[in-house]
Amino acid sequence: SDLLMFYYKALQSNPVNRLGNAMHEQKGEVFFTRARTVVENAPDKDAALAYALGFVCHFALDSTCHPYVEAYVRESGVGHCEIETEFDNALMREDGLDPIKFFTASHIKPSRERAEVIAPFYEGVTVDETLAAMKGMITVHHLLQAANPVKRWVVLTGMRVAGKYEFMHGLVANPQPNPKCVQSSQKDRKST
């Protein structure tokens, strides 16, 4: 999954999910400078530190993999999201999990208490908006998890109708690995 704020009212552009998009393009220093202050002043320092460290892991993974993914997009013509999804799926298969059935957001547990820890990391984002983003993440992941062929067809057709297919179809796990991504999944594994 990506930055939490992407999932706030994900089907419409708004200041909160635009912040998620903008942060994805910013230097990490912007977030980490704020995060340091948030952790130092947090009522529950352990919870705030846990969130900050999770963000560090995500940042390190993106920083390491995105240059390769973007080069592979140019080489293969496969979209960024699909390459990342295929890599995730290859790792799940290696661990004996079925990527079509495994719920990838099962670790997200929306609660007001957690939202109170997370919200201060994002300037101008409220606890209610953070909680809604957490719930939105669960909803979007349930929507995109299309183990049933009929649901898969409905989801992908809906993306086409909404004009979002090119950007979003790669977020829906393929029933079989995309042969164009096998090489990228093997290289990604070696670089991480």
Descriptions of predicted regions:
Residues S1-K190:
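N-terminal leader/auxiliary helical segments
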